[in-house]
Amino acid sequence: WKIEIERLKHKSLNIFGFQNKLIKGYLRSILISSLSFFVGGLNGLFIFLLCAFTAKSLLEVINYIEHYGLVRVEGEKVMPRHSWNSNSVMSSIYLYNVTRHSAHHEKPYLKFWELDAYQNAPMMPYGYLSMLYMTIFTPFFFQKIMSRKLAEWDKLFASDEEKKIIKAQF
């Protein structure tokens, strides 16, 4: 809310106007929830809320996987080394190139089909869907596999300052 208010004040816009992205988002949520209720009654509303909860949960798990264990110096620009990527063709097709996560952070203005695969960025050991299932159903196995990848990241990608942060954590 604070960030949005600052954005609107900077542009000399009304904080309660329709340019407020949060208000628009809340209104859309109310509208879709209402439509779900009017079309399907309580069952329709319940199914919509269940779908929304599931989608948000999966998004958070994917976000967790994409940044698992990586460190960055506070205030430093996000670089390609600060997120896990995958060159899995199936994951790229099904997830609209979210697999090219470093490119998304480096060039957030690009459309998903314009994102490039970075060969010199940290790579997940498997595709997104495999990593997702592993994280949800076998978190111990996920952590075991990723601990090896993190050791590799420390050697190949971490800056000297990031190595100091890592050392201070243990």
What do the predicted segments below correspond to?
Residues 24-36:
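Core segments of transmembrane alpha-helices
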Residues 38-46:
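Transmembrane helix interruption/hinge and helix-loop junction motifs
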